[in-house]
Swiss-Prot record:
It is found in: Secreted. Residues 67-86 are annotated as: Disordered. One of its GO terms (molecular function) is toxin activity. It comes from Lychas mucronatus. One of its GO terms (biological process) is regulation of blood pressure. Its main location: secreted. Residues 1-22 form the signal peptide. One of its GO terms (cellular component) is extracellular region. Disulfide bonds: none annotated. Belongs to the non-disulfide-bridged peptide (NDBP) superfamily. Long chain multifunctional peptide (group 2) family. This is Bradykinin-potentiating peptide 25.12. Inhibits angiotensin-converting enzyme (ACE), but does not serve as substrate for the enzyme. Potentiates bradykinin (BK) on the isolated guinea pig ileum as well as the isolated rat uterus for contraction. Also potentiates in vivo the depressor effect of BK on arterial blood pressure in the normotensive anesthetized rat. Keywords: Cleavage on pair of basic residues, Hypotensive agent, Metalloenzyme inhibitor, Metalloprotease inhibitor, Protease inhibitor, Secreted, Signal, Toxin. Expressed by the venom gland.
Length: 86
């Protein structure tokens, strides 16, 4: 999955949990949503979201990680250009 998608899913789940806890209308659904929140899938999504958030924050603070020079393709020697006669 894309990092942005994981971040969006992470924040949406946090917002849903906050809204459920703040409204008394959802008291009956609160237990069901707690089960969903504690499920394995939700935990994995939160973990991935936290990792993506930490990586994004590190990229913003330190700049993007550069690829090592050995992995880069070797540069070709410059091609000599012929002079045009005017």
């Amino acid at each position: 999955m894309n990092k942005r998608v994981l971040l969006v899913i992470f924040f949406v789940t946090l917002l849903i949990a906050d809204e459920v806890n703040s409204f008394s209308f959802f008291r009956k659904a609160k237990g069901f949503l707690k089960k969903i929140w504690k499920s394995k899938i939700a935990r994995r999504l939160r973990e991935k979201g936290m990792k993506a958030l930490k990586n994004y924050a590190n990229d913003v603070i330190n700049g993007p990680a550069e690829a090592p020079a050995a992995a880069a393709a070797p540069e070709e020697p410059p091609v000599e250009q012929r002079r045009r006669r005017r």
